[in-house]
């Protein structure tokens, strides 16, 4: 029997109605998903190499998690590493601004200055070893104003302490070489001023050595070997952090007692370090980042003055250099690496 035309039309219309209903059922969750707020993005801007920078990321992620933000679940993080090349920082900061990240975490003085120059609206949480007021990052420590706040590491006060500890290990030292990175003139001037003042106070002469490339580090050590200073003071610097293995090898090869700012150098064979506990500083930065993601303004968060410092000494290196670590020195150490 030939079906009636009207029955065919009715069947066709029913199929259309079913498909329309199905299409609406599929489209509804897609539309609802599109209406959900976008996942916030944190932009991490760092001067160091990846292998150095990732060492303290667990502390940052932990405190961020305590504020309710878990990477990959309800927050995304984009990492940009300058690998010790400060000239790359402006473009890396500009990328994060173009990416429209929710907040920029800047983990060094050069990175913080690059971030501040790139935006006056995106919140910035910094970690710096210099006075953030003098750097122009904030109006004051208690009332930052603007779009930036963070953690200050007290580098100036640490220089005198670090130099004094080096003198305890090498009491016969009369002249100390100071290694600085000229590609960061602001930090170099600050570091040199602090070390010169500390050296005068304890009767030490200093010799300045400059290096901003791998080759220049080798050249600096050749000069050091030729002129034979009694010890070496390596100023805190992101490029030097990235070259910590090279520096530890060279100090061992030339038998130079050397003082560093971070424990990472001592873990790869350096003699001693005294400085900020970077993991603790990253925890503080993570906490501030989480609060800003919740809507707190950087201007309302006072700059945190880092107060957790650590002395680390490598006893194997002490012996290899023919030195003796006094018992009271070892007693003050937060960690002794055998």
Explain the meaning of each model-derived region.
Residues 1-338:
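Short hydrophobic alpha-helices and adjacent helix-cap/hinge residues
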